[in-house]
């Protein structure tokens, strides 16, 4: 391989990607590290410097929290994306954004390749590589961890030999990924689907036994499907989600224990914490119920399921995803209003909703004297609505008589 070929590495600061810097150098590459802040709470300045210490020639630290919130989490919210009905797509949402930034840095640096730290067993390798190829088919994609196939002990030996710092949390049994939409946790005792997750597996949510005994009421304002304020206070979308993570998390909202079907064909037990996401998803759905006509409200879940599958399966940049985005955007035009939510003992309970575009007419719905519904019109409607069933019954009875 000729010298001075650049590769842009998605760098997390952990053992795998730190070792990958040195390993890629041994393959003849100059390594440019790319560190993204998508709301995981890490000290990104420290991670940026660590990349340089372990041998990267350049280290980018990109604050992508607001872009992640506006372009990725908001789509997940408006599409109510819950993979297999339970998983709000925490990690799956950040991967296309990370891929996008890797490609942008690679093009800026005239790199010939990008690299990630995924193993050959998970979903993320697919999400990264499919996204990268969709954005720039000319870039080579390298997967050092998948290629070297070392055991943990062999990796540690390599790190010590090359003076690479060993993370202090290396003994943790868990594999954790976090962004502002939530936190995922796997491995260790969680690999046993019968074992109850220990409290040490959680970080964003309070155990139910320790949550406040008094509920907290909040009001969330939406404008065209986008949450903009809590209790009348305006927030950027990223700050709003992070604030809700804290508020709802204190009440134990958003714990999810799920055995899911991975893209690569295996089942995996995952524990998720998504206090802000779960609260927003419930509030947004209730506002849609108030403002969408029945036909749209009944059809939209079909789109939502497909959208969740596309995102989970790494097809964010696919043509179908783009087409579904257009439908989704159209459905949000009147999803404006305020939703009142009670947070209590692990639950986010919607207790009220209002909108200038509300399709709920109290005078039509009421059973009091104010009722304006035309009851006489019901007779003709029922006759026409049931006509096909009635005709079918008449015809079949005639045939039975002939027999």
From Swiss-Prot:
Keyword field contains Magnesium: no
InterPro entries membership: Arginosuc_syn_C, Arginosuc_syn_N, Arginosuc_synth, Arginosuc_synth_CS, Arginosuc_synth_type_1_subfam, AS_cat/multimer_dom_body, Rossmann-like_a/b/a_fold
Any GO CC annotation of this UniProt entry: cytoplasm
Binding site for L-citrulline: 87, 123, 127, 175, 184, 260, 272
EC numbers for this chain: 6.3.4.5
Statement: the UniProt record of this protein carries the keyword Amino-acid biosynthesis: yes
Catalytic reaction(s) noted: L-citrulline + L-aspartate + ATP = 2-(N(omega)-L-arginino)succinate + AMP + diphosphate + H(+)
Chain residues that bind L-aspartate: 119, 123-124
Enzyme class: ligase
Gene Ontology molecular function terms on file: argininosuccinate synthase activity; ATP binding
UniProt GO BP: argininosuccinate metabolic process; L-arginine biosynthetic process; urea cycle
Pfam (any one): Arginosuc_synth
Family: Belongs to the argininosuccinate synthase family. Type 1 subfamily.
Name of the protein: Argininosuccinate synthase
């Amino acid at each position: 391989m000729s010298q001075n070929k650049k590769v842009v590495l998605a760098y997390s600061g952990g053992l795998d990607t730190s070792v990958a810097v040195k390993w890629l150098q041994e393959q003849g590459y100059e390594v440019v590290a790319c560190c993204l802040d998508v709301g995981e709470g890490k000290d990104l300045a420290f991670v940026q410097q660590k990349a340089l210490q372990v041998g990267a020639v350049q280290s980018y630290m990109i604050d992508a929290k607001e872009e992640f919130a506006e372009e990725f989490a908001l789509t997940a919210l408006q599409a109510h994306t819950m993979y297999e009905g339970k998983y709000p797509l925490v990690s799956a949402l950040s991967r296309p954004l990370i891929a996008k930034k890797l490609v942008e840095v690679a093009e800026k640096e005239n790199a010939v390749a990008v690299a990630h730290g995924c193993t050959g067993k998970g979903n993320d390798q697919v999400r990264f590589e499919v996204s990268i190829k969709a954005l720039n088919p000319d870039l080579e994609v390298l997967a050092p961890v998948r290629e070297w196939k070392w055991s943990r002990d062999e990796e540690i030996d390599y790190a010590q030999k090359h003076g690479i710092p060993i993370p202090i949390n290396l003994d943790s049994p868990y594999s954790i990924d976090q962004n502002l939409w939530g936190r995922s946790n796997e491995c260790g005792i969680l690999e046993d689907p019968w074992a109850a997750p220990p409290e040490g597996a959680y970080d964003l949510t309070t155990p139910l036994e320790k949550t406040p005994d008094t509920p907290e009421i909040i009001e969330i304002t939406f404008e065209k499907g986008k949450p903009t304020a809590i209790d009348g206070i305006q927030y950027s979308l990223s700050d709003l989600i992070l604030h809700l993570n804290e508020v709802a998390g204190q009440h134990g909202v958003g714990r999810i224990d799920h055995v899911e079907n991975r893209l690569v064909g295996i089942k995996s037990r995952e524990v998720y914490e998504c206090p802000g996401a779960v609260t927003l998803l419930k509030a947004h759905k209730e506002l849609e119920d108030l403002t969408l006509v029945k036909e749209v409200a009944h059809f939209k879940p079909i789109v939502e399921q497909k959208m969740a599958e596309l995102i989970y399966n790494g097809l964010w940049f696919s043509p179908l995803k783009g087409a579904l985005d257009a439908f989704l955007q159209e459905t949000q035009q009147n999803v404006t209003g305020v939703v009142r939510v009670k947070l209590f003992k692990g639950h986010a309970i919607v207790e009220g909703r209002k909108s200038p575009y509300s399709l709920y007419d109290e005078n039509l719905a009421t059973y009091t004297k104010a009722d304006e519904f035309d009851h006489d019109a019901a007779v003709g409607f029922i006759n026409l609505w049931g006509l096909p069933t009635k005709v079918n019954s008449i015809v079949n009875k005639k045939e039975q008589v002939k027999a």
